[in-house]
């Protein structure tokens, strides 16, 4: 199930008092204001306490249908909170999945909360030993763009969000890899990612 023109248009019609708040683009009706879930200072323990759930629900009930997150935000906690909020809204019949435009991103390595004692061991066990990537595919100890890693990362996002599909999946700061790969190899890498996801 993905966002549809009919459903996103129907969602926008629930808020007739919002003049010029919605825009049609690529056969979907988006709220001009979206909900993002990035949080700075990732190593502070209080950043991992669930506190977005009610905010996500209130944003959607107030007319926002564009939700943006990433697999690495708060080590997956942001996606998990959105997933809880969506499940509650779906059960209340407050919104349908097709009315929402859900976006996530892949590229940065999504360590899991609680933060592993040794992130390098986590990367070795979960990414390298599972053949999602080789050590040399990982830039700055935190960014990976192999097609297999990104497919795995996307599946983790779907699981965290509790949905079967994403409407938009972004490559998260792919330019990080240009210095290491060079421009021509970088473009070939992007092409291989698109082929994997088509």
Can you describe what each PLM-predicted range is?
Residues 126-198:
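Glycine/proline-rich, positively charged
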Residues 1-121, 164:
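N-terminal binding-site loop/beta-alpha segment at the start of enzyme catalytic domains
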């Amino acid at each position: 199930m993905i966002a549809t023109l009919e459903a996103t248009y129907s969602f926008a019609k629930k808020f007739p008092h919002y003049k010029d708040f919605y825009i049609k683009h690529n056969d979907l009706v988006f709220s001009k204001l979206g909900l993002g879930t990035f949080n700075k200072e990732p190593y502070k323990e209080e950043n991992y306490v669930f506190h977005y759930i009610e905010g996500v629900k209130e944003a959607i009930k107030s007319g926002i249908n564009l939700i943006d997150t990433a697999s690495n935000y708060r080590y997956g906690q942001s996606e998990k909170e959105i997933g809880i909020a969506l499940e509650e809204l779906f059960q209340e019949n407050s919104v349908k999945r097709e009315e929402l435009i859900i976006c996530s991103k892949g590229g940065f390595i999504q360590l899991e909360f609680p933060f592993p004692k040794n992130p390098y061991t986590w990367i070795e066990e979960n990414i390298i030993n599972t053949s999602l990537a080789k050590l040399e595919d990982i830039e700055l100890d935190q960014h990976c763009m192999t097609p297999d890693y990104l497919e795995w990362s996307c599946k983790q996002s779907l699981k965290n969000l509790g949905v079967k599909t994403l409407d938009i999946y972004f490559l998260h700061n792919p330019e990080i890899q240009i210095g290491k790969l060079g421009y021509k190899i970088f473009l070939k890498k992007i092409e291989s990612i698109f082929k994997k996801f088509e």
